[in-house]
């Protein structure tokens, strides 16, 4: 089927195509407004790119062929060897999981057939959310609702621009919004180590407030804010290094807000028991909803992490970190952490899937590896079997689920390279078992 959004440049019909409304697979926001040119197989981002998307789309692929222990083979031979290794394994581990919806479905099917464990490489950050959602629940917004309606944003943590370079441009300070419901000026508050005030500008941004503190102090600051909102006296002069007077000022901002959003990115909250910080953020939202409209917004989800968790949930009934050793899915967020299992020597084969970024390497391990990776993937040691695969949204069409978990977006085939889909390779391995 021809892509209606792709058009050939006049006078250069054979070698030059322009793709409009391209969805970028290189971060969890899945920005879908890019324009990308394909000239003789080389891609160039022409509009609405960021550093992450430009690096991803414009990366030159090195020559890559299927290999068995470093020796070039055909894809059929690599599939046969991978199937033999998986069939012999007592406890195969299916990790990485940087793929699209179809690839994740195929990974779960193969893991079920092989009696393996399934866990995404970035699930440690995700479980900072899952533990709170499972135990207490929450009220969340979406990227679109935040963009269109928020008049107060409280950004918890830092490095959001590193995860999502266009978050502030597209969501916090967009040039326009729907329905003309956005406040004329929105206030942005930063609580964390590196306030990103310089990233927030534009006609819709009014005041920006920075409450700098260490990441391990964010929970204390949020706790003091919740106490003051509920009318409790705080005897200390500071909380988390922030003067109580500044926290009182934030209380007034919260009370004046018509649609407030608390934003956090679990991958940036890298500290022991970070779920307690997430719990304070979502608890703040619950407190404020007693009298007004407030919501949370969790970011992250790069490398297909949100997609993997969503597919796992609707296929098995459980989030990631499940085992099919018994023939049915068994969920244990501690026991089935692949990183922990590799350190403890509990797996005898690692099947690693990394189809998006070349830096998404497996951990160093003595366990034999079957790798489905984008060409140029940086491996800590040679794989028993390596099979180059295409990147969804670049080398083939597909679907990914956005970081706010409310929509799956279609990915176009930009025809960079003729590489197989993860889903097809995994299906071939399963058929060969």
Q: Which residue ranges define each predicted feature?
A:
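N-terminal, charge-rich interaction modules
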Residues: 16-33, 270, 299-317
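Short connector loops at secondary-structure junctions
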Residues: 116-136, 293-320
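Non-catalytic alpha/beta scaffold blocks inside enzyme catalytic domains
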Residues: 130-289, 324-433
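Short helix-loop-beta junction
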Residues: 110-117, 283-291
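N-terminal export/assembly segments and adjacent metallocofactor-ligating motifs
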Residues: 1-227, 266-267, 431
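Generic macromolecular interface patches on structured domains
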Residues: 92, 235, 291-294
